[in-house]
Amino acid sequence: MSSNISPNVLLLMTDAQRRDTLGCYGNRLVRTSAIDSLAAEGVRFTEWHVPNPLCMPARASLMTGHYPSSHGVRTNGMNLGDALPTIAELLVNAGYWTASVGKLHLNFWWADKPGYSQEGRADWSVGRRRIDLPYFGFQAVDMAIGHNEDSWGPYAEWLAEVCPEGHALMQPENALRVPSGALCTWDSALPAEVHCTNWVADRTIARLRTRDSDHPFFVVASFPDPHMSYSPPEPYCRMYDPTDVSPPLQREGELDRMPPHFRAYYEGTGYCREMFEDKTLNMLPAAAHTDLQWRDMRAHHWGQVTLIDDAVGRILAVVDELGLRENTVVIFTTDHGALMGDHGMHMHGPFHYDGQLRIPAIWRWPGQFPAGPGPPRDARSYCRPSPAARAMARSLGGARECGLCRR
């Protein structure tokens, strides 16, 4: 690759994915051949940590190169403002064409009334049909908002056109078999070909094929899964036997040594208590889960990951088909992890445990990162947002680092 040609950038991103769901990070049961190949051909980060284990703060940090204390998105529900440039805006200024497909979540989803958020359900419920462009520096946007059975926006509207019964098929009452009772865990009746994961892959491929070839590109393919609900379609929902899954990490009496909000969440009386009190959501607190239910939750999570891996494989095949491999940086990561029973907790929140803080991160850059036989090359990075955005801005065709946090 010529050093004076700006490389393309393809950012493959998931939501709430544990690093131990990938073969390249030591899981010997889950099938993730496409992502594992990225690690074998590039660099696998072993100490890549999130600055905040919630979606909006973590995503704002990745896109701005700032910590939550600087960009202001300290928790979910706080919109990212325009005071700081995003990496997409910096790259546009450096001559890049930019596109985002899938989940962005830089605006709040659950505003009470329209006008606060382009991504909010309230706006889409009163007639919004597109995202105003450019959106945080992205010149093209195909957005998926929400998760699985609770989705709205462009993906949900596309699904209603091609599969009118799709929304109903995703609901737990239409599960393919009786659920185990684990939190938000069931076998989705939605056909895999119209699942959001495959829609993100299809739209990403379409964007790559129709890109502005006169400019290098920055394309984000952001899968809303494997965030809960843990409801993959066939064949992924039955791909892994819960009895083969390792139990969560728990120590007897450990909650007794932790601050009170840990036990309150465990019992369903603290963080997220409104969801646990709403019986229509079938949201069980962690204390109500059995060992087999934790394993069943993880088995479904693995199924979601393999569905994503198949989608990643399709995208990477098109990168090769279009002759883009040698001049394209491919990055795979997630916004944060998930606890899934570790330390008696599920989901993710104000608990600083490895399961939700230490995440997968893989970079493939032909000609810059050596590839060859043997195990993946490892690198260390103790916090994600600033080093990643700075390195990207330094390396990609002279995009200036102005506005990026240097701490």
Show which residues each predicted segment covers:
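Formylglycine-dependent sulfatase
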Residues: 1-407
